Each structure stands twice: as C-alpha cells, then as structure tokens.
Design a protein with these regions (language model features):
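A generic structural signal for ordered secondary structure
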Residues: 2, 21, 93-97
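Short, aromatic-enriched amphipathic alpha-helices that serve as compact interaction elements
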Residues: 1-16
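A solvent-exposed, acidic/Ser-Thr-rich amphipathic alpha-helical stretch
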Residues: 4, 18-20, 26-69
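A short alpha-helix capping/helix-coil boundary motif
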Residues: 13, 27, 74-76
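A beta-strand edge to alpha-helix "cap/lid" segment located at domain peripheries
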Residues: 53-59, 63-139
C-alpha cells in the first residue's frame, strides 16, 4: 500500500463501496482530524458508515500524492452535500492528509483542514458571524 493507492480508493469512495477501506487501513489505525480521534479499524469503519449515511453526497478529488519511505501525503478537495449545511448545497473543503504505513497498510492518518470552512461557516446564524470574523482578521 502506498499514498497513490490510498488516493485511488478515496477517489472512488461512495456509500456503496466503503468495504474498500478495509484494504487500506491497519487494524490498529489511529485517525485524527479537527473534530475526531479514532483508534482501531472498527471505530474508523463506524465513523465512515455514519458519515456516509448522513450525507447526500461526499466525494474526494485527490490533487497530489507524495511518499517517502513509510510516510505519505495527499492534497485533496472534498465536496460534501449535507441537508443541514448550507441549506443542502455543496460545500467544498481543501485539505491535506498525513499518512504513515505499517505492514502494507495505513497505521496513522491525520487530516488537516479548516473546520470552519467545512462546518461553522455553513451553519445558519453562526456561518455569517464566522465569515465576518475571518474577513476582519484578513484586513
């Protein structure tokens, strides 16, 4: 397993083929992002099952893949359509995944992305406040 193969799985991923992830992740995987820390394949499998049950659509567009020895990186854009975000419209989030491999599978996966871009900016009421704060910080 390498970063390119992981990227290919995420490119193809949808709610009907989540079983593909079992070929990617080590049973002792640690997965982290801005909102979660999950330990073990069963926890990660449940996370993805719940994620895809609650969204209208979720797609990953992989832009770059890099690997040196047992460490890899992916740059990506996720498009997410959820009925409670942005009135059900598509949300685009750019991110980077840091991957570590052991025994041919991903043992560590850390996603870096702006949680505000994905969530807070797309919630009723709170979204406008967050966007205003970000604009003022940029001045």
């Amino acid at each position: 397993m390498d970063a390119m193969k992981v990227g290919n799985v995420y490119r193809a991923l949808n709610k009907d083929n989540l079983h593909l992830l079992a070929d990617v992740y080590h049973r002792n995987v640690v997965f982290e992002d801005a909102a979660h820390r999950l330990e073990g394949w069963q926890a990660l499998e449940l996370y993805f099952t719940n994620l895809y049950e609650n969204v209208v659509d979720c797609r990953f567009y992989i832009h770059e893949q890099y690997q040196i020895d047992n460490v890899g990186f992916l740059t990506w854009t996720m498009t997410l359509q959820h009925p409670k975000l942005k009135k059900g419209a598509c949300v685009e989030v750019k991110g980077v995944s840091h991957l570590k491999f052991e025994a041919g599978k991903v043992i560590y996966h850390r996603d870096y992305f702006d949680l505000g871009e994905m969530l807070y900016e797309n919630l009723p009421l709170l979204g406008g406040i967050i966007r205003t704060i970000k604009q003022r910080l940029g001045q």
